[in-house]
């Protein structure tokens, strides 16, 4: 996970407590299974946990590597030394997604062996595309690509058929929760992953997941619970405003994140129930506590997270002209909740 929204201070704080209790993982772990060796990426951090996991898969002299870390020199040394010590070569590199902490080591790997073929769902120049359902085989391992966007638009998981195990990338982590670029798509991908019924997960960050079905179920439950809480807050506010106004209508404008009426939009008033919508900050206060509203990380992380859920509700049709609640997005971070 790297870049933009994911690198905000909010997420550093979100995972910091968990990170302090993370188990220590070996730099190289060849005891995960008979055909999977894990190499840490030497990039520990609040978002990367113990570091990015990269996996050497197979049992023969030619194997497949999943992900390449962010480009730490120690990682390249660790991998190439292991290959030389065990007389192993890499035929293919499969990249789970475009984030730099998973793709940054490609150049070092190709410098070691230019014959390696690099695969990514949306390939960069010189790389090959990965199609959903595409199979990659090496001695002792058969990997099937599963398109699972949401955390990233090009996110791929890989199902190891011999073990009924899933390389989960950043969709499901070994500790805590992941984050998403597109919440609705991400939730759909989690459900798709659950349907694969894999027993073990090899995540992009953190320790191996020995109870993958339960972990995915927990991820989905957490997403759904937050969605329901935000929707309930909107519904309660709409009912409360309708009751106070006796069901009457009046002209309203948009509501800014500070809760103030927007003068420009007031010039375009329409006949709506006499209520002012909740601002993103007000919803954040009701969901996470009032102190969140004035947090320096609200604009960088909490607000965008809430807007993800609000847009998802709109896209799902849970907030539309045909039900009692309508969320009208007039500009980013501005919305009203009239009763229809």
UniProtKB/Swiss-Prot annotation:
Database matches in InterPro entries: LACTB2-like_MBL-fold, Metallo-B-lactamas, RibonucZ/Hydroxyglut_hydro, Sec-metab_biosynth-thioest
Co-factor(s): Zn(2+)
Active site residues per record: 101 (proton donor/acceptor)
Single GO term (MF): metal ion binding
EC class (word): hydrolase
Any one biological process term the GO annotation gives: secondary metabolite biosynthetic process
Binding site for Zn(2+) 1: 97, 99, 205
Biased composition (Low complexity): 242-258
The record's free-text note on cofactor binding: Binds 2 Zn(2+) ions per subunit.
Gene3D superfamilies: Ribonuclease Z/Hydroxyacylglutathione hydrolase-like (3.60.15.10)
Pfam families in the cross-refs: Lactamase_B
Reaction it catalyzes: 3,5,7,9,11,13-hexaoxotetradecanoyl-[ACP] = dehydrocitreoisocoumarin + holo-[ACP] + H2O; 3,5,7,9,11-pentaoxododecanoyl-[ACP] = 6,8-dihydroxy-3-(2-oxopropyl)-isocoumarin + holo-[ACP] + H2O
Keyword tags: Hydrolase, Metal-binding, Zinc
Source organism, top-level taxon: Eukaryota
Binding residues annotated for Zn(2+) 2, in chain numbering: 101-102
Record region (Disordered): 242-271
The protein's Enzyme Commission number: 3.1.2.-
UniProt cross-references to SMART domains, sorted A to Z: Lactamase_B
Physiological role: Thioesterase; part of the pkg gene cluster that mediates the biosynthesis of dihydrocitreoisocoumarin and 6,8-dihydroxy-3-(2-oxopropyl)-isocoumarin. The non-reducing polyketide synthase pkgA performs the condensation of one acetyl-CoA starter unit with 6 and 5 malonyl-CoA units, respectively. As pkgA lacks a releasing domain, the thioesterase pkgB is necessary to break the thioester bond and release dihydrocitreoisocoumarin and 6,8-dihydroxy-3-(2-oxopropyl)-isocoumarin from pkgA.
Family named by the database record: Belongs to the metallo-beta-lactamase superfamily.
Protein name according to UniProt: Thioesterase pkgB
Organism: Emericella nidulans (strain FGSC A4 / ATCC 38163 / CBS 112.46 / NRRL 194 / M139) (Aspergillus nidulans)
Gene designation: pkgB
